[in-house]
Amino acid sequence: MTLGERMLHYRARNRISQSKLAELMDEDLMTIYRIENGIHKPHKINEIRLTEKMDKLEAEERGKDTND
């Protein structure tokens, strides 16, 4: 699954906007939009950084699921 697909699936599961995801990841809204839509593929170092942020959000999401 690509980073953009992960972002899209995360947003769908959590019913949040691209704007909210950008806020949670401390990223620019246009960055989220471009990656999700396959318009932009970040440089490797940025992709790693963004992937780490997605990993953290998904881990927090899993933690909420087990605490509910």
Residue ranges: model-predicted function:
Residues M1-T2:
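A detector for short, charged/polar N-terminal pre-domain segments
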Residues M25, I35-E36, N46, M54:
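DNA major-groove recognition helix of helix-turn-helix
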Residues I16-Y33:
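Short alpha-helical DNA-recognition segment
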Residues H43-G63:
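DNA major-groove recognition helix of helix-turn-helix/homeodomain DNA-binding modules
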Residues T66-D68:
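Helix-turn-helix/homeodomain-like alpha-helical modules used for DNA recognition
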Residues A12, D26, N37-I39:
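Residue-level detection of the helix-turn-helix DNA-binding "recognition helix"
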Residues E5-K20, R49, K64:
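Short basic helix-loop element that most often maps to the first helix and adjoining turn
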